[in-house]
Amino acid sequence: MKLCRFLAKGRLHHGVYREGILLDEAGEAHDPEGVTWLLPFTPGKVSGVALNYADHAEELGLSRPEEPALFWKPNNSLLPHKGVVRYPKGAEYMHYEVELAVVVGRPLRRVKAKEALDYVLGYTIANDLVVRDYVSNTFRPPIRAKGRDTFGPLGPFLVVGEVEDPQNLTLRAYVNGELRQEGHTSRMLYSVAELLEYISEFMTLEPYDVILTGTPKGISRVLPGDVMRLEIQGLGALENQIGRASCRERV
């Protein structure tokens, strides 16, 4: 089931997506192009995993991590499907990252990998945007690079009960219709279940917490005006355009 939230005719709706149509609580149909999309749920904590694909580490000239390399993605960065990303004034190199996002369904603490997927509510698509200008200091990745307002597009759906194996999904990222990035979740260094075991060993995960599971190789620069379309097999497509920097927006 593909769950979503949207505004239509001045009202907030919790709906479901079926065969190209949005159905609200009353069963009324809405055109996906005629609504204002919201985040599909209200996220709790949002954690990211850096360098979880060997080919991405290699394209950056970095070593594979010996254990999952975690970071926070602050909630102020989150942006729904079709929301406009704010390009920081003066930024030299900004890029997209298509990622499978895992949504926790019930409290998770010290759970083994073989049981971890039982605690997953569903999955969605994330775009872990980065200004690489600020990934050259000693802390990787710095919040200034990844935690900016609008730098965490998420959605469009919370997909529940449809993903049989999170390690068997194809990921793709397009910029202005051109395929820029393609990978497969089977290439993760640490699987979804292994990540949940690792994180829950020292931190309680709660309902609607989100884990961004890393990106494969294929990053490239994006600029104001570009349209990013991220697709994950069975999860739909997350699309956002990059707007021009505000005169008050600073790197």
Residue ranges and their predicted role:
Residues 55-57, 78-81, 109-112, 131-134:
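Short, well-ordered, mixed-charge alpha-helical segments that flank or form enzyme active sites
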Residues 89-92, 108-113, 158-162:
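Short helix-to-loop capping/linker segments positioned immediately adjacent to catalytic or ligand/cofactor-binding
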Residues 109-123:
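N-terminal accessory regions of nucleic-acid-interacting proteins
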Residues 72-86, 108-109, 150-157, 217-220:
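Short catalytic-site patches enriched in acidic/histidine residues
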Residues 2-91, 96:
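Extended, compositionally biased flexible segments
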Residues 98-100:
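Ligand-binding beta-strand-loop-alpha-helix segment within the catalytic cores
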Residues 17, 33-39, 56, 64, ...:
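Catalytic-pocket segment enriched in acidic/His residues
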